[in-house]
């Protein structure tokens, strides 16, 4: 075997090549630290693999913020997340990094973000209308096209990382901890994204992937929303995940994909893949979800969930799909009738990847003794007596 066939992004290929080195060389980035005394933790919102997340108050202006306290991790990874957030700051529907603080004693870094008044997706997605789904998908695409145009792949698109303030119809794409700069020809770690949203390229260990990875993950989100099946591809491990995909997209196109890129499939797949025909999207429609499905929704989905990453729609192409015609028309009408306002800071619940939603906070008791609050205390952020008390 001569090794895999190289691949380059179809769009925004050389963005970082044309930028000055300091734009993408995050290892050399010098972090400017703010004052941790400006923030008081109020309650814990959740935890993830790499951090603990709190609602907090900025005592200088009394505004709610979200504080993401990073667990011990390589300095390089922290710098990457910070540099990416700084590069993307002000972009459409990108969570705003407000401050970076560190306790002088523990050296624990924490990222301070705008607050998003998020509704848990498991509750929210069950209530969304056809138009709502189109609207929010379009809002995610604005964020993705922007970050891709800035030479950045998110690499962890999933419902947990999309904060929606439904009352104000505001959306933010959060948790840029796995995001990376795209350099054509570079081989990347395939251990990114969450299992149910991993693209086939990750599952077959193809490392020369690009922005199109995010478009697969978005397709998985769309499928789960329109078919009311969460998650849509429900694998029990990374191998089974590809099997679940093959049972829908068929094995024939999978083998065409691995042949095209000269990918060597892990021998473990020999016993579990089998042979499967490509299923029609219509077979997933039933009485409970038919009000969310339309021919244009299925056509759009079909153009996202493609094995071949080069065949998927780009974020910009996706925004021009007929699925969004009504949304585009409405937004054009609104912007012509109202003064175009800037991006309003929004509010958040689970502010990062893999956060398990925390139940309605109980009065302080058990929370105060938690190692998280202890860690936060050592961070030099004073915890008010009412931390964790119900608002």
UniProtKB/Swiss-Prot annotation:
Species in which this protein is naturally found: Mus musculus
Additional facts recorded: Can use both ATP and GTP as phosphoryl donors. Phosphorylation by casein kinase 2 has been estimated to represent up to one quarter of the eukaryotic phosphoproteome.
Keyword Kinase appears in the UniProt entry: yes
SUPFAM superfamilies: Protein kinase-like (PK-like)
Highest classification ranks of the organism: Eukaryota, Metazoa, Chordata, Craniata, Vertebrata
Matching InterPro entries: CK2_alpha (IPR045216), Kinase-like_dom_sf (IPR011009), Prot_kinase_dom (IPR000719), Protein_kinase_ATP_BS (IPR017441), Ser/Thr_kinase_AS (IPR008271)
Catalytic residues as annotated in Swiss-Prot or TrEMBL: 156 (proton acceptor)
Catalytic activity entry: L-seryl-[protein] + ATP = O-phospho-L-seryl-[protein] + ADP + H(+); L-threonyl-[protein] + ATP = O-phospho-L-threonyl-[protein] + ADP + H(+)
Protein's name in the database: Casein kinase II subunit alpha
Cellular component aspect of the GO annotation: chromatin; cytosol; nucleus; protein kinase CK2 complex
Modified residues (Phosphothreonine): 344, 360
């Amino acid at each position: 075997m001569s090794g895999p066939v190289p691949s380059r992004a179809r769009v925004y290929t050389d963005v970082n090549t044309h930028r000055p080195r300091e734009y993408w060389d995050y290892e050399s980035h010098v972090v400017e630290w703010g004052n941790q005394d400006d923030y008081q933790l109020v309650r814990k919102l959740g935890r993830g693999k790499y951090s603990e997340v709190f609602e907090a108050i900025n005592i200088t202006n009394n505004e709610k913020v979200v504080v993401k306290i990073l667990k011990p991790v390589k300095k390089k990874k922290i710098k990457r997340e910070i540099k990416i957030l700084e590069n993307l700051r002000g972009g459409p529907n990108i969570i705003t990094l407000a401050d970076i603080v560190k306790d002088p004693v523990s050296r624990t870094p924490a990222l301070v973000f705008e607050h998003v008044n998020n509704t848990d997706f498991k509750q929210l997605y069950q209530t969304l209308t056809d138009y709502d789904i189109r609207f929010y998908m379009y809002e995610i695409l604005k964020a993705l096209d922007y970050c891709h145009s800035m030479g950045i792949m998110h690499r962890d698109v999933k419902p947990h990382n999309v904060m929606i303030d439904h009352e104000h119809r505001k959306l933010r794409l959060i948790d840029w901890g796995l995001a990376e700069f795209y350099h054509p020809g570079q081989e990347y770690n395939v251990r990114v994204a969450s299992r149910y949203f991993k693209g086939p390229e990750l599952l077959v260990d193809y490392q020369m992937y690009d922005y199109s990875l995010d478009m697969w993950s978005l397709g998985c989100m769309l499928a789960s929303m329109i078919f009311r099946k969460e998650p849509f591809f429900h694998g029990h491990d990374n191998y089974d995940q590809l099997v679940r995909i093959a049972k829908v997209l068929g094995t024939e196109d999978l083998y065409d994909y691995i042949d095209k890129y000269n990918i060597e499939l892990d021998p473990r797949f020999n016993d579990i893949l089998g042979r499967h025909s490509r299923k029609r999207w219509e077979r997933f429609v039933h009485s409970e979800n038919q009000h969310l499905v339309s021919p244009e929704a299925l056509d759009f989905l079909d153009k996202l969930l493609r094995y071949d990453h080069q065949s998927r729609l780009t974020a910009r192409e996706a925004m021009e799909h007929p699925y969004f015609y009504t949304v585009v028309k409405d937004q054009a009408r609104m912007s012509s009738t109202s003064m175009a306002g800037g991006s309003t800071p929004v509010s958040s619940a689970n502010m990062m990847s893999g956060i398990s939603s925390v139940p309605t906070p109980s009065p302080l008791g058990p929370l105060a003794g938690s190692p998280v609050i202890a860690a936060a205390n050592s961070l030099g952020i004073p915890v008010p007596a009412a931390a964790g008390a119900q608002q």
